[in-house]
Structures are given as C-alpha cells and as structure tokens.
C-alpha cells in the first residue's frame, strides 16, 4: 500500500494531481479543497489511500490522515465506492461530516452527488457508531451558507483564478441554482469565467 506521496507537483486538474516522486509521476485523485492546497512546481505531500480493483489501481490523496481514515470508513458502507466517498469529503470536511452522521442529518448527506435518501440513511445507520469523536458545533454548516461554495472557490483558486473572482463567479452560479452540486457549480463557474 502507498500511504503517502511526496514530490514535485507536475500537473493539477479538476479531480486529480500528478506528483512526481523518485522519477515516477503518480496520478492522485483528490477533492477540490485538497487540490487547492497544491501549486505546480512546488514540493508537496499527500496522505494517500490505494484502492486496488480487478481492472485498476487508484491513489486517492488527502491533506491529512484524519480525512484519509474517514474515507476508509465511508468505504465500509454498502453501496459506497471510492468516488462517492471522495465526493462526500469534497462537500463536507471531516468534522462537519462526522457531525452530520452523529446528528443523523440525512438531508445534509443527500447534498452529496450520488447519495440519495436511502443511501444517506444507510450511511447514518452503519457509521453513527464508527465515525470517531465529534467536535461540538452548531450542526452542519457550510462556508458562505452553502455546502458547495467552499470547495468550488478553492478549486478555482487552485486553477489560478483570483480569490475574489472565484468567489464572485461561485456566488452568481449558486444564486442562479441553489441546489447545484459541487461538480455542476464548478463547471458553471469555469464556463462563466471563461467568457470574461
């Protein structure tokens, strides 16, 4: 198992980064917020989880071990694969997700692309006792009052847009479509910024 990758960031895309370590470029799938912490040409370290399937070997990268461990816990839920687990961590950071699971907040979990009401109920049922310590908080909140705003803004900044420009584009997209998912909001914001 590859537990972490450290090296020069060669490329950053919407859903992955390529990190060169010892002459080998590792494609690491990651959330927009994790990708936003990386810069091309700089040395970075990501904690990783390696998922081996019959037809693929995929690395998933995280900013810290806590997020990686929660990713592994999410994979234990029937019907939740690596893509949905990563999408969940793209919408909610680890403490917020733990709080949603502890509170049984099915509505918050259904905001994650790919998770319906039944899937959210299954997650709460299977993970409520496995999620680890929950920090005290006021329930599930998101940056700017919207669950997808933070990850979308961070992804846009990671792609080279100015923070103010990214925030304005994201706010316009979310004002037009308050129920937008992270991926659809990011696509719409990129389209909007591309027209300027």
Curated annotation (Swiss-Prot):
GO terms for molecular function: ATP binding; four-way junction DNA binding; four-way junction helicase activity. GO terms for biological process: DNA recombination; DNA repair. SUPFAM superfamilies: DNA helicase RuvA subunit, C-terminal domain, Nucleic acid-binding proteins, RuvA domain 2-like. Its main location: cytoplasm. It is found in: Cytoplasm. Residues 64-142 are annotated as: Domain II. Residues 143-151 are annotated as: Flexible linker. Keywords: Cytoplasm, DNA damage, DNA recombination, DNA repair, DNA-binding. It comes from the Bacteria. InterPro entries: DNA_helicase_Holl-junc_RuvA_I, Hlx-hairpin-Hlx_DNA-bd_motif, NA-bd_OB-fold, RuvA, RuvA_2-like, RuvA_C, RuvA_C_sf. One of its GO terms (cellular component) is Holliday junction resolvase complex. Residues 151-196 are annotated as: Domain III. Residues 1-63 are annotated as: Domain I. The RuvA-RuvB-RuvC complex processes Holliday junction (HJ) DNA during genetic recombination and DNA repair, while the RuvA-RuvB complex plays an important role in the rescue of blocked DNA replication forks via replication fork reversal (RFR). RuvA specifically binds to HJ cruciform DNA, conferring on it an open structure. The RuvB hexamer acts as an ATP-dependent pump, pulling dsDNA into and through the RuvAB complex. HJ branch migration allows RuvC to scan DNA until it finds its consensus sequence, where it cleaves and resolves the cruciform DNA. Homotetramer. Forms an RuvA(8)-RuvB(12)-Holliday junction (HJ) complex. HJ DNA is sandwiched between 2 RuvA tetramers; dsDNA enters through RuvA and exits via RuvB. An RuvB hexamer assembles on each DNA strand where it exits the tetramer. Each RuvB hexamer is contacted by two RuvA subunits (via domain III) on 2 adjacent RuvB subunits; this complex drives branch migration. In the full resolvosome a probable DNA-RuvA(4)-RuvB(12)-RuvC(2) complex forms which resolves the HJ. Belongs to the RuvA family. Has three domains with a flexible linker between the domains II and III and assumes an 'L' shape. Domain III is highly mobile and contacts RuvB. This is Holliday junction branch migration complex subunit RuvA. The lineage of its organism: Bacteria, Bacillati, Actinomycetota, Actinomycetes, Mycobacteriales.
């Amino acid at each position: 198992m590859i537990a972490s990758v450290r090296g020069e960031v060669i490329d950053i895309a919407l859903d992955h980064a390529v990190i060169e370590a010892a002459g080998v470029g590792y494609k690491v799938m990651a959330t927009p917020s994790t990708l936003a912490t990386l810069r091309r040409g700089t040395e970075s370290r990501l904690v990783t989880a390696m998922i081996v399937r019959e037809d693929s070997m995929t690395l998933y990268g995280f900013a810290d071990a806590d997020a990686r461990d929660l990713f592994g816990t999410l994979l234990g839920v029937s019907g939740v694969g690596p893509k949905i687990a990563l999408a969940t961590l793209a919408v909610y950071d680890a403490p917020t997700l733990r709080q949603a699971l502890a509170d049984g907040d099915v509505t918050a979990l259904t905001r994650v692309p790919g998770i319906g009401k039944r899937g959210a109920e299954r997650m709460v049922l299977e993970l409520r006792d496995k999620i680890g310590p929950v920090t005290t908080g006021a329930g599930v909140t998101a940056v700017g009052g919207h669950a997808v705003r933070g990850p979308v803004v961070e992804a846009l900044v990671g792609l080279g847009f100015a923070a103010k420009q990214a925030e304005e584009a994201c706010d316009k997209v979310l004002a037009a479509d308050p129920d937008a998912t992270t991926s659809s909001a990011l696509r719409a914001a990129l389209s909007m910024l591309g027209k300027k």
